[in-house]
């Protein structure tokens, strides 16, 4: 009897330079999310079909072109789906914050070798994560992880998620968890103030949900602030020269230990909930897709306009996350106004900035009550 195994592979060129990321010679803006392969009730034990579904959600529903496997290599079925869909994968070594003793480091180094051997035939894999996420500098250890991975795969660059400015850069790309945004001012730090070597590639490996969690049952105003937070950092990472792209934190809510999260062992950091139901923040990503058919149009309104849910029964800020050129507001059959994205506003660098609805009346008071709209 003959055992047989088929392995798919592909060819493409990858380059990180000071000016950004290039795939097959074309500049590509990385727009992705981090992914925990954790699910409600089942944990990590979901079958291949559900692992593949996450790749489809990222690519088709959310319009992402990249994903970071935080903080460990993930299901082969997920990587297979990323290959098929054309979803770039930043694969990361296992670990979180802690670096142990010599025996621990030897095992971590072996984990790195196994990660490369298991994943290197996947053309979707474009970047190796060789630092333990959130850890401090350790020159001797991280020299070994870089060398081990480059020895097994000299074709792909290495990176590692740094949590402080100007940490030691042994990798090919400086990846930075940028949680600097607090709702005003620049939404991400200046690249030149973070990386110790501006000649190398630079990307934002995390931002967003950890700074501003939102439960799916939070009120509209809270969910809107989270969505606008994601939009602001996405915008500023695109606008800043030399940033290869960003990975928002994160795809979906996930279970955690009691010391981290909201006290119920759940982190509500995702743009989707544990069951993969989208929150408003998911529309920030989905609305950046280029519509090629009417079915590709995304239209998500931040408010249901249910007066009983609004403080004082008064509508507050209302935004539409859409990739349409404009939206029209009607009150019943009466036309109120047409609204378009502000191409000079806070989100001007986005392909499709969210649209603010700031007039709910138009000329209706004049029409029905004889009142001057002015």
Task: Annotate each predicted stretch with a short phrase.
Residues 3-13, 17, 250, 267, ...:
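An acidic-aromatic loop/edge-strand motif
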Residues 54-60, 66-281, 294-309, 316-318, ...:
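Substrate-binding/catalytic cleft of secreted carbohydrate-active enzymes
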Residues 1-89, 111, 126-127, 145-151, ...:
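Secreted/periplasmic carbohydrate-active enzymes, especially glycoside hydrolases
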